[in-house]
């Protein structure tokens, strides 16, 4: 650009050109005027009561692209090797041209002498040697690149195979865990059903146990009741004996099936006497003792390990922190007390043939012909009721949760917003730079009324007592005026 003269510089200062502004470039626009700042300030004031919200989470920052469009990773060594190959190729091309030019010059300068021919042959040999060296280097580099590519591809294939195997193993482990949890849940559900079935049977037998306490003590008493009753009692005894024998056989078969003991190790008696029945039960209880203790200890330890109750409770001597086997052993240690509690006639049952129960019970109220386990029966009923209440509560809470979830998932759609059936409105911005008046003076209402009455040139009496006196005076004057009126003497001129 040519240098401006003094006259041109003066003319530019006298008549400056306006600044060229790109109206489409919103980022670099800067008017430099103070009004722009005021407008921005006013707009901020108009929207300062709006709720500040963050960026919407409906769209991600980066677009969702297919993984095949992602760029591949290249090592730095491979990048520099490619550049070196390009440079070597260019240098070799230039060198060959230069050599050809030199050969042409030498041929033009030479006169066909032998010395010139010898020099040309030597140069050709040197060129052939250089080309062979370059070819060998190129082959070595290409071999190295191929080996590196093969190593990279093999490493990638190995890594993919390892990842595939790891993913497969994790899926298999998750599947096995799900199957194991399902089997455990099914086993627990089955055990719960079996326990409830036994509990229902025990509740059903309670009436039979209570009725058995009213049976006669001796055969002579039964004979006195009559032949029909005697036959009924004999049939009942036979059925009970068969029932106890079946229970003993069932316990024996279940123990053999679960490998608790061998089938030949315990032989049950086939006699139906009372002593034989007790002997069979004692044998089974003795064989089951070790198995029951091991099973109770095993599952008690698992339950305590899964729950943090044992870790939180520092005292290990509490009953809750001990194993189930120890708790059962501690409860059965005082067997005399437990047996004595079952010989109390709490239901006031009267034995058939006896008029009173006092004759066959001792001073402490213990009756050897009574079996009453009402305490244990009440505990069973309490556990059953608590379990049923918990189940019903969990079901009701599940229904409530499902209802709440359904209510949340329901779309909030206004059915009246279509076809112009709803008033559409826009929230107006609040008034700017406005402050409502706030009373800061301490005048009372009487003082304010007196002030404004004085300004208007009137006098107002704010004393209520004076008003009452004036009213009394007015009433007295009205009464006096009424007394001065001429009384009615009964004379009427018109009709």
From Swiss-Prot:
Sequence ranges of Basic and acidic residues compositional bias: 46-62
Composition bias, Acidic residues: 23-45, 81-151
Any one GO cellular component localisation term in the record: nucleolus
Gene Ontology BP terms: maturation of SSU-rRNA from tricistronic rRNA transcript (SSU-rRNA, 5.8S rRNA, LSU-rRNA)
Keywords: Nucleus
Signal peptide: none
Span list, region Disordered: 10-155, 462-495
Subcellular location: Nucleus, Nucleolus
Family: Belongs to the AATF family.
Protein name, UniProt field: Protein BFR2
Organism: Yarrowia lipolytica (strain CLIB 122 / E 150) (Yeast)
């Amino acid at each position: 650009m040519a240098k401006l003269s003094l006259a041109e510089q003066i003319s530019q200062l006298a008549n400056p050109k306006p600044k060229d502004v790109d109206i489409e470039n919103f980022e670099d626009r800067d008017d430099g005027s103070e009004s722009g700042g005021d407008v921005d300030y006013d707009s901020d004031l108009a929207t300062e009561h709006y709720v500040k919200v963050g960026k919407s989470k409906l769209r991600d920052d980066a677009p969702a692209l297919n993984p095949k469009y992602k760029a591949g990773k290249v090592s730095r060594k491979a990048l520099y090797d490619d550049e070196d190959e390009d440079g070597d190729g260019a240098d070799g091309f230039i060198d060959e041209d230069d050599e050809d030019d030199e050969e042409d010059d030498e041929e033009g300068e030479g006169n066909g002498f032998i010395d010139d021919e010898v020099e040309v042959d030597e140069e050709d040999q040197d060129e052939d040697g250089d080309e062979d060296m370059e070819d060998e280097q190129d082959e070595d580099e290409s071999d190295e690149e191929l080996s590196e590519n093969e190593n990279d591809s093999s490493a990638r294939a190995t890594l993919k195979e390892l990842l595939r195997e790891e993913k497969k193993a994790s899926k298999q482990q998750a599947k096995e865990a799900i199957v194991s949890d399902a089997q455990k849940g099914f086993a627990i559900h089955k055990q719960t059903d079996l326990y409830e079935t036994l509990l229902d049977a025990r509740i059903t037998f309670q009436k039979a146990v209570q009725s058995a306490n009213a049976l006669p003590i001796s055969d002579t008493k039964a004979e006195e009741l009559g032949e029909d009753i005697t036959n009924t009692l004999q049939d009942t005894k036979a059925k009970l004996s068969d029932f106890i024998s079946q229970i003993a056989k069932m316990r024996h078969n279940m123990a053999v099936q679960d490998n608790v003991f061998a089938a030949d190790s315990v032989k049950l008696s086939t006699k139906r006497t009372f002593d034989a029945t007790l002997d069979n039960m004692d044998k089974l209880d003795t064989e089951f003792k070790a198995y029951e203790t091991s099973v109770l200890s095993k599952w008690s330890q698992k339950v305590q390990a899964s729950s943090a109750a044992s870790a939180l409770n520092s005292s290990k001597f509490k009953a809750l922190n001990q194993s189930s086997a120890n708790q059962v052993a501690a409860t059965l240690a005082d067997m005399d007390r437990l047996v004595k509690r079952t010989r109390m006639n709490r239901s006031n049952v009267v034995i058939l043939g006896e008029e009173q129960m006092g004759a066959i019970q001792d001073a402490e109220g213990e009756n050897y012909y009574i079996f009453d386990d009402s305490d244990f029966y009440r505990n069973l009923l309490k556990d059953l009721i608590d379990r049923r209440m918990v189940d019903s509560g969990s079901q009701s809470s599940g229904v409530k949760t499902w209802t709440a979830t359904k209510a949340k998932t329901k779309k909030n759609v206004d059915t009246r917003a279509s076809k112009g059936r709803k008033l559409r409105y826009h929230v107006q911005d609040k008034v700017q730079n406005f402050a409502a008046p706030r009373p800061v003076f301490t005048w009372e209402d009487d003082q304010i009324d007196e002030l404004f009455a004085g300004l208007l040139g009137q006098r107002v009496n704010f004393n209520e007592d004076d008003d009452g006196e004036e009213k009394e005076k007015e009433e007295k004057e009205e009464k006096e005026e009424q007394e001065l009126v001429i009384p009615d003497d009964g004379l009427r001129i018109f009709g």
